[in-house]
């Protein structure tokens, strides 16, 4: 049985504004209501929303230190200095490295890239990486998706004659590293108009700035946008403002002319080129790229994403895909073990937080397992495993509205290191400190969390009758894409529906529901629906009982044919039971 969810209707948009916009655009009032909810209130704003334009990208030189960064890169290119592009091992880091490396190798042969080993060096800039750069004669390191807290590492590099340019999007501390340039839209003294770029996005702004300064046509940057949209989707940054523009054109590039490495991933994922969405990246492409860093080496992901030869791309992609299959098997096993630990009470905490530890678990999947436990129990969750002798490392995931990073930071005196965001973080501490850490963080969470945060919420955008789901409605709804944080796929509520008798359990273990739904008030208008992990509702539906259903609308493509399907978020029984 799933955790019970609360349905919450979004506040109604201004009725007169909705009516006027509906009239001006000639669209269903439900669609104009969705637009107004998103801050799109006029015809001109709707035009900009539906027709993203690359000319609306922000001037990259508005970012603090951009002049310094461009000047130092130019100096290295002209002087023939060796440049090392350095990034994290996750999707954002490897796409960022691939983007900047792909651009710079057009300008110089004195270039290489470096991805730290997850289990040997850990996250971010490492002393080992700097030593490798020094031993191989590099004079400039460009960090991507990391480095904003690498104060000591920057000084260590400087002592060895190496300059650093930091491109990051994480929150900085009070004192910035003394690098040649620190590009981070979250700097307090940075007045860049949009601060939710991905790490790859910051790298793109550096490339864009260099191109502007030295008259490189912007059109030559378009092929890099397939990397950028993979980053935007996988790192869950908001798909608003500049990110909406970049994601729109990135998806176009990914669908029409993807690089060899991404084409290999698309094919290995069983996806159909030409119809890829943000969801396809989040659930299919991104996890495969991530598997390289989780199971083997993030360097393999960059080799894939920068491959110029299709045979090489397929070879590397096939190996990464095998790592992903291995990752999924390990993920399933550890998730089951963790669930059993919590249910049996054999865990470190199961009060207001879920904390589990097993020294044998694979470090590369503990973040995924933490997310699974949040789905199961809906509590702030930390999954620990052993990392080195005497040390444990953990991945933390939170519930909506609760700042788990703040909770972890309150225990910083017990930690060797930590980092992350509001809802996701990583941490390392001495094994001997684990009991007191669990006690303190459980106490912090108990004092800080409120009841509203302890029950998942389905935010419903609008009520909808099945009869309103016409080809025109779907055509316009599709133009709301790309979806993501800040522009989520609309969730609709349709009341008093039932299955036409064709409903069945599907999936390897029969855990999902495949339905053909009919609304009682429109009995001749049925529509296909899928409810993932909702098999527990099967008996109720099979008996012919009516339900209310919340869902988003998706298009599935198979051999060039599009099929509309409801992706069910939740179902509620109605009072009038059979």
Question: Each predicted region: which residue ranges?
Answer:
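Short glycine-cluster motifs
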Residues: 382-398
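N-terminal small/polar loop signature for handling phosphorylated ligands or for N-terminal nucleophile
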Residues: 64-177, 182-183, 333, 374, ...
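Cofactor-/ligand-binding subdomain signature composed of acidic, glycine-rich
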Residues: 1-79, 230, 284-319
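Acidic, two-metal ion nucleic-acid-processing modules in DNA metabolism proteins
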Residues: 100, 105, 110, 241-341, ...
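Divalent metal-coordination and catalytic microenvironments
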Residues: 35, 88-90, 142, 168, ...
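Functional cores that coordinate and move charged inorganic groups
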Residues: 135-138, 146, 151-294, 298-304, ...
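Flexible, glycine/threonine-enriched loop-and-boundary segments that flank and lead into catalytic domains
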Residues: 344-371
């Amino acid at each position: 049985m799933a955790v019970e969810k609360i349905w919450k209707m979004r506040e109604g948009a201004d009725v007169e504004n909705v009516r006027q916009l509906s009239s001006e655009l000639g669209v269903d009032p439900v669609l104009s209501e969705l637009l107004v909810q998103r801050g799109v209130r006029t015809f001109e704003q709707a035009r900009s929303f539906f027709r993203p334009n690359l000319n609306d990208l922000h001037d990259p030189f508005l970012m603090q230190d951009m002049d310094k960064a461009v000047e130092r890169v130019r100096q290295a290119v002209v002087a023939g200095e060796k440049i090392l592009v350095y990034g994290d091992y996750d999707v954002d880091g490897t796409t960022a490295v691939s983007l900047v490396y792909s651009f710079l190798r057009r300008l110089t042969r004195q270039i290489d890239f470096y991805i730290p080993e997850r289990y040997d060096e850990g996250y971010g800039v490492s002393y080992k990486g700097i030593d490798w750069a020094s031993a191989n004669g590099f004079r400039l390191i460009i960090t991507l998706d990391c480095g904003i807290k690498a104060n000591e590492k920057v000084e260590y590099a400087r002592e060895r004659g190496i300059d650093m340019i930091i491109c990051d999007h994480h929150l900085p501390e009070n004192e910035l590293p003394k690098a040649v340039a620190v590009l981070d839209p979250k700097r307090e003294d940075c007045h860049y108009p949009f601060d939710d770029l991905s790490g790859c996005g910051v790298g793109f702004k550096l490339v864009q700035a260099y191109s502007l300064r030295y008259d490189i046509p912007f059109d030559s940057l378009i092929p890099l946008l397939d990397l950028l949209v993979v980053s935007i989707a996988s790192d869950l940054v908001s798909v608003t403002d500049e990110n909406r523009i970049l994601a729109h054109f990135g998806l176009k590039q990914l669908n029409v002319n993807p690089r060899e490495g991404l084409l290999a991933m698309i094919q290995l994922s069983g996806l159909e080129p030409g119809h890829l969405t943000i969801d396809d990246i989040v659930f299919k492409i991104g996890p495969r790229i991530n598997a390289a860093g989780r199971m083997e080496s993030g360097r393999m992901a960059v080799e894939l994403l920068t491959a110029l030869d299709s045979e090489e791309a397929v070879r590397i992609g096939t190996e990464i895909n095998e790592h992903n299959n291995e990752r999924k098997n390990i993920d399933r096993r550890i998730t089951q073990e963790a669930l059993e630990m919590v249910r049996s009470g054999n865990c470190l905490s199961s009060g207001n937080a879920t904390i589990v530890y097993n020294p044998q678990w694979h470090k590369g999947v503990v973040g995924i397992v933490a997310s699974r436990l949040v789905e199961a129990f809906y509590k702030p969750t930390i999954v620990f495993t052993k990392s080195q002798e005497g040390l444990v490392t953990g991945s933390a995931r939170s519930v909506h509205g609760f700042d788990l990073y703040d909770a972890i930071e309150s225990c910083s005196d017990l930690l060797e290191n930590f980092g992350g965001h509001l809802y996701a973080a990583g941490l390392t501490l001495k094994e001997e400190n684990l009991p007191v850490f669990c006690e303190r963080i459980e106490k912090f969470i108990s004092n800080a969390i409120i009841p509203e945060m302890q029950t998942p919420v389905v935010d419903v955008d609008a009520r909808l009758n099945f009869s309103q789901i016409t080809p025109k409605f779907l055509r316009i709804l599709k133009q709301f894409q790309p979806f993501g944080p800040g522009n989520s796929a609309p969730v609709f509520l349709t009341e008093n529906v039932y299955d036409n008798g064709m409903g069945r359990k599907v999936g390897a273990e029969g855990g999902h529901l495949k339905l053909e739904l009919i609304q009682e008030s429109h009995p001749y208008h049925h529509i296909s629906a899928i409810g993932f992990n909702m098999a527990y509702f099967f008996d109720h539906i099979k008996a012919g009982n009516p339900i209310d259903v919340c869902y988003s609308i998706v298009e599935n493509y198979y051999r060039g044919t599009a099929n509309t399907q409801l992706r069910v978020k939740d179902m509620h029984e109605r009072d009038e039971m059979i």
